[in-house]
Amino acid sequence: MTHVEMKQRLTPLYGEREAQAILRMVLEMRFGMSHADILCGKVTQLSADDTEELEKIIARLEKNEPVQYILGQSDFYGRQFHVTPAVLIPRPETEELCTWIKETAGQSSPKRAILDIGTGSGCIAVTLALELPGSQVEAWDISRDALLVAQQNAERLGATVKFVENDVQKVADPSMKWDIIVSNPPYITLQEKAEMEANVLAYEPHLALFAPNNDAMHFYRLISHYAARNLNDGGMVFFEINPLFSDGIKETLLSHGFTDIVVKSDTFGKQRFVRGTYTKDYLEGQKTADV
């Protein structure tokens, strides 16, 4: 099977450009080929066992299975993260969220306490631990399988992160204090299913995709409530959001006493991120004014 033949099989599904990118990823990451090797047609020189494995990979790709799950890894923030169907495949937009946090937090004390709620693969928590040295990073998820993947990523990449099986819908510990709380929670509604790619719907975990009870605001309310009680003075909450609900999320933060609320667009121009600041003096002033 030649490179051209493989591309011809995948192009109807993925388009020529993406099919070529996927094939290059497979040949480089799984079979150790360089771009020059691919151009020189060395795929035809693979051993019988490797050729059989490659054929199985192409067959899985023809069924729309994400190449990241097939290879067991995904690039995020210049690092390779292990991924399985127990976790979402990290998105480029989430890299932008990490950069925003890094740029904002870089102006504060290095001994900051960071909490990542709904960590999945651990891509946010691990990235922040590595990019903001000295930070104490904790990450929660309700899925044990996801936490195992996240722990593997932290160990392999040399990041110090405390992973905890925890549910923000039940947690209530006012003694835990944070400087930054970040979350990219499930926020997709059932009405948006028709617009989603088939491979996402078929293979990625619905628990991490779809908002419970079709309520896209569910986790934003819960996390805002928790953050308002567990952030240190001047602490911040960062969300990745469903652009359709940016106004509602902003209002939720306002109703929980957050100030300096910023809605930020991603590189595609969609309102994708929100940041709010908890200010103790502001809240006490509001209470005084109410009296």
Language-model regions, residue ranges each:
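An acidic site on a long C-lobe helix of protein kinase domains
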Residues: 50, 90-93, 219
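Alpha-helical elements of Rossmann-like donor-binding domains used by nucleotide-donor carbohydrate transfer enzymes
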Residues: 5, 9, 25, 53-56, ...
